[in-house]
């Protein structure tokens, strides 16, 4: 068998193994008809056990840390060397797909499996972590697992309860973990040299570009606001059009402005009016008040802030012209997370090697890399998903794309770990 044929066979075998393992993980669900696996549930602990077995088979030392992350280490040429950390999350949203998070953990295991089969050790160790909670489905707190690793887990999180009234502290105890030992999950800055995460794109850009893989430039920052137009309710038949103070008409005008201005700004900025409530909400009454939400995101904070200021200014102008009032309250803010430029370049080089060219794009969704990047240089590799669908049972990737992803990821990891 030629080297090319052998490499192709190895790629196909690795991809097939990842796809089969994703199916096995998908079977670990609290509901039979829809994949749901939340933090510290029996299914999460079963997933940890299974992933730990796969890590061990790939030649790794395996442990579960004090916040419920499953971890593995493949030693470097010198024992105790700093590690290149690979990972993603093993928890899901409700009624989830089977690749969000899991693909990154499984592909990372394949990187180590390949080195183990070849009997190779690199200058740096390689560690893999399957984070216990990225989604925040159970407790409404995101990045629990990765914040455990960075040592940025606030003590107040322990008292947060799920819908059944079970606190994080009690859930840890129920899982055989000790809430008093949370800090033991934190890694010293010198333990880790860099972090690389492989993840499905969760959007349509790679598919539209006809590419299997892309490199993330930044994880979008976000602002979320509760907004309100207040006018004057009135009889739908007796108040002339020129005398109306229609809150819904003002909101509709602003929504079109939100769309148009965001498109004009470009720069991968996005804006969404996701909810709208109209009062009094009767067919024969002019709307007197409209409450709506605004979600805006972008890969750089300054353009995002400028867009928000312009949108709020437009809302005030519309309200003033229509003799209404407008108010907005920001209730959520997260800064953009830039990926490390050197690691981006390494990933781009690896992607070009396997698919001929690369594409740089932002991540509109949050990832564990947000927390990890606060401590260590971090970067992400995206894999195309069918139709950009995610957080849904129809979430899908192809084995061919997974094979390319494993190849590119392996190249990048080896370059970083041997530097």
Question: What residue ranges belong to the model's regions?
Answer:
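Catalytic-core environment of secreted peptidases
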Residues: 58, 66, 70-103
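Midchain, well-structured core segments that form catalytic/ion-binding scaffolds
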Residues: 133-134, 138-301
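A short beta-alpha structural unit
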Residues: 36-40, 272-281, 293-295, 299, ...
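Zn-dependent metallopeptidase/amidohydrolase metal-coordination segment
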Residues: 18-24, 87-88, 358-408
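N-terminal capping segment at the start of a domain
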Residues: 2-41, 391
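His/Asp/Glu-rich mid-to-C-terminal helical/loop segments that flank catalytic regions of hydrolases
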Residues: 219, 235, 239-265, 313, ...
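Alpha-helical metal-binding/catalytic segments enriched in His/Glu/Asp
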Residues: 86, 95-135, 223-229, 238-261, ...
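A non-catalytic alpha/beta surface segment that caps or lines the substrate-entry region
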Residues: 30-75
């Amino acid at each position: 068998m030629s080297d090319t044929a052998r490499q192709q066979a190895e790629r196909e075998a690795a991809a097939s193994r990842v796809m089969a393992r994703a199916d096995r993980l998908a079977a670990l669900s609290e509901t039979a008809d829809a994949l749901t696996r939340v933090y510290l549930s029996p299914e999460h602990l079963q997933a940890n056990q299974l992933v730990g077995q796969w890590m061990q088979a790939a030649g790794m030392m395996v442990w579960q840390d004090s916040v419920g992350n499953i971890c593995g280490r493949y030693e470097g040429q010198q024992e105790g060397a700093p590690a290149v950390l690979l990972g993603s999350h093993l928890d899901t949203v409700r009624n989830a797909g089977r690749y969000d998070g899991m693909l990154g953990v499984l592909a990372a295991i394949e990187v180590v499996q390949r080195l183990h089969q070849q009997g190779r050790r690199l200058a740096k160790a390689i560690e893999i972590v399957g984070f216990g909670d990225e989604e925040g489905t159970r407790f409404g707190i995101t990045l629990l697992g990765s914040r455990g690793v960075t040592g940025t887990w606030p003590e107040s999180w322990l008292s947060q309860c799920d819908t059944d009234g079970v606190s994080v502290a009690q859930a840890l105890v129920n899982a055989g973990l000790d809430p008093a030992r949370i800090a033991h999950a934190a890694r010293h800055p010198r333990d880790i040299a860099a972090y690389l995460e492989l993840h499905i794109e969760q959007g349509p850009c790679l598919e539209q570009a006809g590419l299997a893989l892309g490199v993330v430039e930044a994880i979008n920052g976000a602002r979320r606001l509760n907004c309100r137009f207040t006018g004057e309710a009135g009889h739908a038949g007796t108040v002339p059009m020129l005398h109306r103070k229609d809150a819904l008409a003002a909101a509709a005008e602003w929504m079109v402005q939100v769309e148009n201005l965001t498109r004009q700004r470009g720069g991968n900025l996005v804006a969404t009016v996701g909810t709208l409530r109209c009062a009094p909400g009767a067919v024969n009454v002019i709307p007197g008040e409209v409450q709506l939400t605004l979600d805006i995101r972008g890969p750089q904070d300054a353009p995002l802030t400028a867009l928000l200021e312009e949108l709020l200014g437009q809302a005030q102008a519309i309200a003033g012209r229509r003799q209404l009032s407008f108010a907005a309250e920001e209730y959520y803010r997260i800064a953009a997370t830039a990926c490390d430029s050197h690691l981006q370049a390494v990933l781009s080089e690896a992607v070009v090697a396997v698919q001929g060219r690369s594409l740089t794009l932002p991540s509109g969704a949050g990832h564990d890399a947000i927390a990890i990047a606060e401590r260590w240089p971090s970067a992400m590799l995206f894999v195309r998903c069918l139709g950009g669908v995610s957080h849904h049972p129809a979430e899908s990737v192809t084995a061919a794309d997974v094979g390319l992803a494993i190849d590119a990821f392996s190249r990048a990891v080896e370059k970083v770990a041997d530097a």
